[in-house]
Amino acid sequence: MSISEACPAEVDVAIVGAGMAGTTLAMLLGKAGRKVALIDPHRVHHEEFRAEKIGMDQMLLFEKLGLDATLKRLVTSTTDTHVFRLGQFFAHEKKAEFTFSYGALINGLRDALPAQVPLTVGKVTEVSTGPDRQRLVLADGAVIDARLLVVATGHGEAVRRAVGVERIEQSKAHSLSMGFDLAISPRNFGHQSVTCYSRRAADRIAYISIFPLGDKMRANMFLYRNVAEAWTRAFRQEPQKMLCELMPEIAARCGNFEIASPVEVRQISLSTTQGHRRDGVIFIGDAFCTTCPTPGVGIGRVMTDVDQLHSVHIPRWLETPGMAADKINAFYDDPVKVAADEDGMRVSYYAKSITAGTGLEWRARRLRNNTARQLMIIGRKVRHLGQRRAPSMA
């Protein structure tokens, strides 16, 4: 990664925010020969508890964009997951997953930026947008003039407010994510990774996912509670005790849940954007809408934005003069983007309802699903018993 001391005065695209969306879009546009300014307040992305795992579906998006080789150097790969439901072993899944520390991943992506796309370290203090050119003023007085402004600032609000666009909360404090390291080593863990679903709806826990991350075992737990409630405070004080009570079926496999780090917590609200259909500026990723991490579709949604902008819209827009709202609206109305956003919201609400919904419909669904799963567990045990008896009967 090169650092720009004097940012380019005139560019095709100015991207504010060098997280997942902003950095990958800048990388792709730079490789395509576009003149790009990538601006972020921080030279090095700080350690931050956010996404820590993706599946093969998301990796295929990176592969489509030619970014998979870069990404695979920054992740830990797994292929084997033992799943526990209803307090019992349920399934052995063979599927590829990729784990990472978010801050380290973003810094690795920044390091892979092409030389023609330096990172401009600075804070945007003024924004002017229009149908032809967009003007950014940084705290040091530097001015960037661009045909298109892309806002990829995640949950940051400063640039959003400067543009005059509002974030609308659809479901406040929708879910809670927790992350922590286990003391047990990957070598002694016994399984490559484990997913354990809560046995009781009253616990309001979706599941815990335990996976290798480098030379340590990492746990992510997804639940439907508030960061300020007594249960959450108690868990942060005594995570080992509460985990052994909540999920005794996997405690022995997890070194009795001895914890080797503080418990990190992230409260998630579902949100959308209002007033974004305007000249010259695009909001992408979490700067446009936020979904729940429990279903695991967030990075896929973010990279769909990047893909559609890079592959479809920006090349078309730059072919002709102007950057009025009619061009911008083509992105927001893109059926691929719309489907990804709508699916992300749909599964966010569904995951909460099927886990902790108290209405008759959701209680009936849980009963149906758990009955079917219990029958599957019994069937597997019967088959296993039959296989054990067969040799002695021969």
Please identify what each model-predicted range represents.
Residues G22-T23:
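N-terminal Rossmann-fold NAD(P) dinucleotide-binding loop
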Residues V227-L318:
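FAD/FMN-dependent oxidoreductases across multiple families
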Residues G30-R50:
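Glycine-rich FAD pyrophosphate-binding loop
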Residues E5-G19:
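Beta1/beta-strand and adjacent pyrophosphate-binding region of the FAD-binding site
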Residues A152-A251:
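Conserved FAD-binding catalytic core of PHBH/FMO-like flavoproteins
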Residues R43-E63:
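Conserved N-terminal glycine-rich FAD pyrophosphate-binding loop of Rossmann-like flavoproteins
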Residues S311-A394:
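C-terminal helical "tail/cap" subdomain of flavin- and related membrane-associated enzymes
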Residues P8-E10, L60, K64, L71-V165, ...:
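Conserved N-terminal helical subregion
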